[in-house]
Swiss-Prot record:
The gene is Naprt. Activity is highest with Mn(2+). Keywords: Cytoplasm, Ligase, Magnesium, Manganese, Metal-binding, Phosphoprotein, Pyridine nucleotide biosynthesis, Transferase. It comes from the Eukaryota. Homodimer. Its cofactor is Mg(2+); Mn(2+). GO terms for biological process: NAD biosynthetic process; NAD biosynthetic process via the salvage pathway; response to oxidative stress. It is found in: Cytoplasm, Cytosol. The lineage of its organism: Eukaryota, Metazoa, Chordata, Craniata, Vertebrata. CDD domains: NAPRTase_A. The modification Phosphohistidine is found at residue 213. Transiently phosphorylated on a His residue during the reaction cycle. Phosphorylation strongly increases the affinity for substrates and increases the rate of nicotinate D-ribonucleotide production. Dephosphorylation regenerates the low-affinity form of the enzyme, leading to product release. Nicotinate binds at residues 21, 210, 318. This is Nicotinate phosphoribosyltransferase. It comes from Rattus norvegicus (Rat).
Length: 538
């Protein structure tokens, strides 16, 4: 992994996780005597991912950790010396050795914010050479984190508020860094938990999981537990031989379900018993190792009823193949009738979890009204973001020495907005979002109830808006290398993301053909763009 530990034992990326041309440009700045000129870059995206109308910002905490720990080691400088021209002035490498972020300031959207095209996720200011070197690692830290958080938010919108979503994609992710990042930011985006224990240990993500088919198929049925006895949940009364009790319950279950007692797989039942002895208060069954109807379900019921007799309650079952929606419906019906038949009514409410390469289409089916599915495990389709594998974030220069800079290209979409800017969110009276406004930092902030002439991006004429509420978007998190505003916890950012999404209009939440959320420019910013464009950015 391209990580090292900071002074608090947390993982941070290393400075050389960057592109070579950052170092070659750095040498160019230094040779031109411009290394220490004050500059500002903005990190943003041009199009919302997945064909949607919004994105969620993520990765800010990782960026601040990276900046606070930034320092090139001797080995880093020696490597750069080996790939730069051999006649490079040694004083340049001494300059690199002395670099830190003590003159860097960062304004940013709070983590978990709604973000829209062109609005800066980060504004990074400091010495030109240094803030140029920061481009690639900051993009790396923000782009994928925001993409995964947005993907998770979309999946949460499809699932609705009541289904529990489990991220289980570590084994399918693009490497350990990708898996770790996905586990953190799918949680921020709205998932309930992750199977990734490292994300739980290092970042506090709630961890959850079931069991795999390998555990079940490893048992033949001839295994004898070293201690088959299980005490009641209340600790009152004698311990019971659990395997023997399960076998007795299996007779009743098979008669009730119309099965022969030899049909349920002996090894599967032994596996369930072993798991129940290890986790009597958290017993769950994976039902499809052999046959759900003829084996997994009756074996699970026998163990669950034996545990229930001792005062324990099974916590769930999982399905991993077949028609998940239909099977869940059938299983819920059996749980209901078996619970009533054997006076264990809690059985009706045992959660049913499903997994099996679930994508947006299948998730919508599993989340439909009347579905008996409670927990949905998603792996590949959350961590790999198959509908769009990259967020497309960019990091562009907007000012040097206090003078605005613009990039003019052959594609109007790729032109940049010059100058140091402020961003505001306009809301209507009921609290839903109206539009975002970008203006020059030197302009007075807009006020609620004030009529403003603004330019919607791409418009040929200005329009007038009158916001009921105005919220500033960018906050100062790092000032001259020192923390300014405390970073929220992951839990706080997750809650903020859900609150932010709740204020988005339904037309903007649509996952297919959504309404476009508008981002506008102030008249002064639009005039600056026109002026610099006409002059060719001279």
């Amino acid at each position: 992994m391209e990580m090292e530990l900071d002074d608090q034992g947390r993982m941070v990326v290393r400075p050389l996780l960057t592109d070579l041309y950052q170092a070659t440009m750095g040498l160019g700045y230094w040779r031109a005597g411009r290394a220490c000129e004050e500059a500002e870059f903005e990190l943003f995206f041009r199009h919302c991912p997945f064909g949607g109308s919004f994105a969620l910002t993520a990765g800010l905490q990782d960026c601040i950790r990276f900046l606070r720990a930034f320092r090139l080691r001797d080995a880093d400088v020696q490597f750069l010396a080996s790939v730069l021209p051999p006649d490079t002035d040694p004083a340049f490498f001494e300059h690199l050795r002395a670099l830190d972020c003590s003159r860097v300031s960062v304004r940013a959207l709070p983590e978990g914010s709604l973000a829209f095209p062109g609005v800066p996720l980060l504004q990074v200011s400091g010495p030109l050479l240094l803030v140029q070197l920061l481009e690639t690692p900051l993009l790396c830290l923000v782009s994928y984190a925001s993409l995964v958080a947005t993907n998770a938010a979309r999946l949460r919108l499809i699932a609705g508020p009541d289904k529990r979503l489990l991220e289980m994609g570590l084994r399918r992710a693009q490497g350990p860094d990708g898996g770790f990042t996905a586990s953190i930011y799918s949680y921020l985006g709205g998932f309930d938990s992750s199977s990734n224990t490292l994300a739980g240990q290092l970042r506090g993500v709630p961890v959850a999981g079931t069991l795999a088919h390998s555990f079940i198929t490893s048992f033949l049925g001839s295994e004898v537990p070293p201690d088959p006895m299980l005490a009641p949940a209340s600790s009152e009364g004698p311990a019971v031989d659990l395997p023997a009790s399960v076998n007795l319950w299996l007779k009743h279950v098979c008669i009730y379900l119309g099965l022969e007692e030899r049909e349920p797989h002996l090894g599967e039942r032994a596996a369930f018993v072993a798991y129940a002895l290890a986790f009597p208060r958290a017993f769950q069954g994976l039902l499809d190792s052999y046959s759900v109807r003829r084996s997994g379900l009756p074996n699970f019921l026998a163990v669950a009823l034996a545990l229930g007799e001792l005062g324990y309650r099974a916590v769930g079952v999982r399905l991993d193949s077949g028609d998940l929606l239909q099977q869940a419906k059938e299983i819920r019906g059996i749980f209901r009738t078996v619970g009533a038949e054997f006076q264990m009514p809690w059985l009706e409410f045992v959660p049913i979890a499903v997994s099996n390469n679930i994508d947006e289409k299948e998730l919508a089916r599993l989340a439909q009204k009347g579905s008996e599915v409670n927990v949905i495990g998603i792996g590949t389709n959350v961590v790999t973001c198959p509908k769009q594998p990259s967020m497309g974030c960019v990091y562009k220069l907007v000012s040097v020495g206090g003078q605005p800079r613009i990039k003019l290209t052959e594609e109007s979409q790729k032109e940049t907005l010059p100058g140091s800017k402020a961003a505001f969110r306009f809301l209507v009276s009921e609290g839903s979002l109206l539009l975002d406004l970008l203006q020059l930092a030197e302009e007075p902030p807009p006020k609620a109830g004030q009529e403003l002439r603004v330019w919607l991006q791409g418009a040929q004429e200005p329009c007038t808006v009158k916001p009921a509420q105005v919220e500033p978007l960018l906050r100062l998190y790092l000032q001259q290398g020192q923390p300014y505003e405390p970073l929220p916890s992951l839990e706080e950012s997750r809650a903020f993301a859900q609150q932010s999404l709740s204020r988005l209009r339904p037309a903007h939440k649509q996952l297919q053909n959504p309404a476009v959320y508008q981002v506008a420019l102030s008249e002064k910013l639009r005039a600056l763009v026109d002026s610099l464009s006409a002059r060719g950015a001279l």
